[in-house]
Regions:
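Enzymes that bind and transform nitrogen-containing heteroaromatic metabolites
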Residues: 2-166
């Protein structure tokens, strides 16, 4: 059975690739959160433990209407509807019949999946932000393997969609 299409979904500070600080986004962009929801509803989402914990802290529960797969060696028994896996490979094997999966962070998970990604949905936030989590260097990978299929500028940020070249 073919593996699902892997889409990386991230909001990144344009100048220094910051994606987080103290387990939180360093910005609040309502339009980006709405886009995140619209893209991911009904699809599995893959994340690291810290990203999962920050979502639960913010929402009081895991993401609704999505199958949450968390990369961790720790038990998530308090969240029986959330699946935990020790590796990306085991998580992907568990969803082999799915059409696509969205990788939603954090830093380590982005690093480990960037090379295998089939697409990227990025929000590039203008400015230089203080942070402790960073998106991996991606410009060369995009240049060599992806085509920009959508670029939508907004006030202070832009959405960019990249698809893998055939």
């Amino acid at each position: 059975m073919a593996r699902p299409e892997i889409i990386i979904l991230a909001a990144i500070a344009g100048k220094n690739r910051v994606i987080g600080k103290d387990g939180k986004l360093p910005w609040h962009i309502s339009e980006d959160l709405k886009r995140f929801k619209r893209l991911t509803i009904g699809y599995p989402v893959l994340m690291g433990r810290k990203t999962f914990e920050s979502i639960v802290e913010r929402l009081g529960k895991p993401l609704p209407e999505r199958r949450s797969l968390v990369l961790t060696s720790k038990s998530l028994a308090e969240h029986p509807d959330v699946e935990s896996y020790p590796s990306i490979e085991s998580a992907l094997a568990a969803i082999a019949g799915e059409e696509k999966i969205f990788v939603i962070g954090g830093e380590r998970v982005f690093k480990e999946t960037l090379e295998m990604a089939d697409g990227l949905e990025l929000t590039i936030v203008e400015g230089d932000y203080d942070g402790d989590a960073f998106f991996p260097e991606y410009e060369e990978i995009i240049e060599n393997r992806f085509s920009l299929t959508l670029k939508e500028g907004k006030d202070g940020f832009r959405f960019e969609t990249y698809e893998k070249r055939q």
